[in-house]
Amino acid sequence: MTPEAQHWQRFIQSMTDRRQEIIRKANLPTTSQRDAHDMLCAVPGYDFAIDLAIEYRNAAEGVPA
């Protein structure tokens, strides 16, 4: 894996971990419905960023789109 691809892989992993943490916190019984809604509204943005980073990682590895 190239250094650039390694960078993107670390970024993908950190974004995936953060996304999972948001979902976990939003589903805690102590989280208000309003806060949970606000947290979960961020998830599609994380999904988009992760998908884009996967494309960049693949491009760094020379994988055709």
What does each model-found stretch correspond to?
Residues 1, 61-65:
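Glycine- and charge-rich intrinsically disordered segments
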Residues 7, 11, 24, 28-62:
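Short, charge-rich amphipathic interface segments used for partner binding and complex assembly
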